[in-house]
Amino acid sequence: MRAREAQASAALLGVTYEILPFDDGRLTPSLEARETLMRTIRRFQPDVIFTNRPCDYHPDHRATGQLVQDCAYLLGGPAICPDTPPLRYTPVILYWHDPFTDPKPFRPDFARPADGDRETLFQVECRHASQFLDWLPWADDRVDLAGKTEAERKAYLRRQFEADEGNVDDAVRACLRRQYGADFADAVRFAESWQVSEYGEEVGDALRALLTGL
């Protein structure tokens, strides 16, 4: 089910989606997982890796962040996973925003306004129905949508979307002001923001422009 939902989301966004062979809720930063991810990164040859920090709320998320860190230094090592050619560069690693403060708060190094992307995000979430129309309504609000029609379930998610006042905290607002000026930044309700990981390469001018439009 989750694989079908992921492919439907990928089709909407026009992206490639590859699912690694680890069960939902059971991922650990094991040697097997590290080498699988290392081979995958080498095959894709990404300029930038987006991931969550290793202090995220979900154990799978924490493990993923740790695995990316564990892979970073060894991506160029020819003796590690010698069946895949090593990278001759280190990708940029960016963490997306989270609200957690332990061991330290998220630091927004770059941000971009995302108010115009809300409808696309809504459509993506609708395609991940088992998450956004089944599990999260129950986990967050104890709302059971089982037995409801698809239209009723989407209407619930739409109401949640429209009631959302925004995701721009003080640190992200300050980042937006530095980049775009206060007049523009203070009108932004929703934004994407990223923290640069010290385990990856520094952000160059081309990527900075791609992320911010500046």
Positions of PLM-derived features:
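Active-site rim/loop-helix segments in enzyme catalytic domains that contact anionic ligands
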Residues: 1-44, 74, 195, 203, ...
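Divalent metal-coordination and catalytic microenvironments
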Residues: 6, 17, 49, 68, ...
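Active-site environment of divalent metal-dependent phosphoester hydrolases
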Residues: 24-26, 55-61, 101-103
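Proline-aspartate-enriched helix->loop->beta-strand connector
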Residues: 33, 37-55, 59, 64
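Short Gly/Thr/Asp-enriched flexible loops that form oxyanion-binding sites at enzyme active sites
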Residues: 59-75
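Short mixed-charge
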Residues: 75-89
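C-terminal accessory domains and tails appended to enzymatic cores
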Residues: 81-82, 103-104, 110-214
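A structural motif
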Residues: 87-103
